[in-house]
Amino acid sequence: LGRTVEKLEAVYDAIEAAGGAQPAIFPMDLASAPESDYAGLAGAVGETFGRLDGLLHNASVLGERRPIENTTWKAWEQVMQVNVNAAFLLTRAMLPLLQAAPRASLLFTSSGVGRKGRAYWGAYAVSKFATEGLMQVLADELENTSEVRVNSLNPGATNTAMRRAAYP
């Protein structure tokens, strides 16, 4: 949807114009948000909506495309924070709200390099393998204990700024 409040507001307006339910905007920087922000977000969503019908993990950063031996810790950590840790923290915080909804859906965005590693995709590929693992573990844990569906989706090549950066 976008990494700016301006883009979120455009989506908000489109939902309203289409006659959808009253939306809400809860900006959060996944690269730096402390754990407590995720609990705060869940509390705000719970107060506003009472439940959560779906959660799409689509936020992701590419990081540096280079050999792992040349990847800096800072670059590695940033990719893992946004692509893996934020998904874990947000999922954990939102699970009670998802479980309060009938047939809620939890969807992770994957990548081909998260299913078969490729040279020079380093931290991004590893983060997508971790995303697949998180999805599989959650799907198994919730299979017979919850109505929450857990899946991942590999959308294939999409025309995004991240893809243009990967393939200049």
Question: Residue spans of the language-model regions?
Answer:
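Substrate-binding pocket helix/loop in short-chain dehydrogenase/reductase
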Residues: 41, 66-68, 75-77
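Conserved NAD(P)H cofactor-binding loop of Rossmann-fold oxidoreductase domains
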Residues: 58-64
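Active-site helix of classical SDR
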Residues: 91, 127
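Active-site-adjacent segment of SDR/Rossmann-fold oxidoreductases
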Residues: 116, 137-148
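Residue(s) in the substrate-gating loop at a strand-loop-helix junction
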Residues: 111
